[in-house]
């Protein structure tokens, strides 16, 4: 891992400051999870809380790298979707998807900061590239470092648990929920 890396989190997240309005109002998805106004920001916030716990429990990770991965893993959604309310996919979103778009955004920022040949940039790019975990789920690469596995598991947990939590709050005690899209339309008790 990159424990003790010199590059700190503030050097990695300049990208967010370039799209602040979009990042904080866009949904995280169109239908699967956090598909509401400011869902992307809330998804990121939830993931940061989970990352804190992962770092407490599992030793050997670079906290700055994991936090930066959480903050930037879905940055491409701000160009993949048309807007914060009732979004559609942009042409770029349809053709490339948020992972590739996010990698492009990260590459531009890294080149502007002259850090595009650093290990930190390469490993952060790996986290963005691999956060869906498996090729069949849209990741161009599968996780290869501890922080990438952690990011994938954190993202997966939040994307599954948030819809369960939202649905259970709407379900009467002793009844089954409506089918949950992100759980292959399973209902929960």
What are these regions (language model features)?
Residues 1-4, 8-9:
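Single conserved hydrophobic/aromatic residue that forms the stacking wall/gate
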Residues 170-189:
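Prokaryote-biased recognition of long, low-complexity C-terminal linker/tail segments
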Residues 18-22:
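Internal, conserved structured core segments that host functional sites
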């Amino acid at each position: 891992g990159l424990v003790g890396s010199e590059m700190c989190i503030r050097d990695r997240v300049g990208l967010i400051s370039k799209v602040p309005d979009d990042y904080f109002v866009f949904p995280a998805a169109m239908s699967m999870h956090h598909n509401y106004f400011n869902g992307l920001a809330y998804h990121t916030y939830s993931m940061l809380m989970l990352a804190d716990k992962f770092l407490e429990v599992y030793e050997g990770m670079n906290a700055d790298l994991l936090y930066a991965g959480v903050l930037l893993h879905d940055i491409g959604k701000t160009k993949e979707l048309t807007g914060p309310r009732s979004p559609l996919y942009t042409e770029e979103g349809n053709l490339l998807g948020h992972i590739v778009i996010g990698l492009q955004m990260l590459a531009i920022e890294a080149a502007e900061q002259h850090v595009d040949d650093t290990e930190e940039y390469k490993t952060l790019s790996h986290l963005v590239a691999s956060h869906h975990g498996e090729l069949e789920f849209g990741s161009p690469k599968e996780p290869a470092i501890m922080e990438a596995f952690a990011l994938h598991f954190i993202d997966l947990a939040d994307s599954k648990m948030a819809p369960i939590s939202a649905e259970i709050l709407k379900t009467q005690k002793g009844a089954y929920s409506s089918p949950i899209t992100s759980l292959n339309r399973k209902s929960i008790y």
